[in-house]
């Protein structure tokens, strides 16, 4: 994606036709999402600013571009929140973010491709959306600093499962996904700095 973005930038530098503008816009949107998955806030902000400048020079603004810009702004805000929590947030939020990072790394090592992180639909969210070959995998991450009092899975109650089901349905409709999909849960017991956190991957978990 980085190479595609650079190629679109070079084209746009010498060509301001609708085709070049469209190529620049959509590769920038995809690049911003890629940087968000990698937690690269500074670089994502630069792409977002470039998109804002591009939008300011458009002769006509399409509804799809406007919607994409709103989603990019939401992605940036979530990145800022994650960074703020990681820097000075309360312990339970720091542990939760650490668990999500661990889960992303765990999935990548298993060959999964991370598509989205912290995807939101209204007040419902999906922690990780990944591809396992051609199968879309929606992942909920549950992290506890200790299992002495409560298992991580205990937080996945009936209401949470219902919200996840709605969010997954919304995402599949929005992205027009017709291929296979499943819902996984990754449970983690440990805290930042742990030498050997306990990680369990529950595949095809019933909602």
Task: Indicate where each model-derived feature is located.
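Alpha-helical junction/boundary sensor with strong preference for TPR arrays
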Residues: 8, 12-15, 55-62
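Residue-level signature for tetratricopeptide repeat
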Residues: 27-30, 34, 75
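Acidic-basic catalytic patches of nuclease active cores, encompassing PD-(D/E)XK
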Residues: 79-117
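Conserved catalytic cores of phosphodiester-cleaving nucleases, focusing on short active-site segments
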Residues: 103, 107, 126-149, 164
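Mg2+/Mn2+-dependent nuclease catalytic core
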Residues: 145-174
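Domain-level recognition of nuclease-like catalytic cores that cleave nucleotide substrates
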Residues: 173-207
């Amino acid at each position: 994606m980085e190479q595609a973005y650079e190629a679109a930038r070079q084209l746009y530098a010498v060509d301001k036709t609708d085709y070049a503008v469209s190529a620049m816009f959509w590769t920038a949107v995809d690049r911003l999402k890629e940087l968000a998955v990698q937690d690269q806030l500074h670089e994502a902000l630069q792409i977002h600013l470039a998109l804002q400048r591009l939008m300011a020079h458009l002769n006509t603004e399409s509804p799809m571009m406007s919607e994409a810009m709103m989603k990019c702004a939401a992605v940036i805000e979530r990145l800022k929140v994650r960074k703020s929590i990681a820097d000075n947030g309360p312990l339970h939020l720091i542990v939760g973010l650490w668990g999500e990072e661990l889960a992303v790394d765990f999935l990548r090592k298993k060959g999964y491709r991370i598509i989205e992180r912290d995807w939101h639909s209204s007040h419902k969210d999906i922690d990780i959306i990944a591809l396992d070959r051609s199968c879309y995998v929606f992942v909920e991450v549950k992290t506890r600093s200790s299992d002495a009092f409560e298992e991580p899975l205990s937080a996945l109650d009936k209401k949470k499962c219902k919200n996840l089901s709605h969010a997954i349905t919304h995402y599949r409709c929005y992205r027009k996904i017709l291929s296979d999909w499943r819902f996984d849960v990754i449970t983690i017991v440990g805290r930042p700095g742990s030498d050997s956190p306990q990680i369990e991957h529950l595949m095809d978990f019933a909602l």
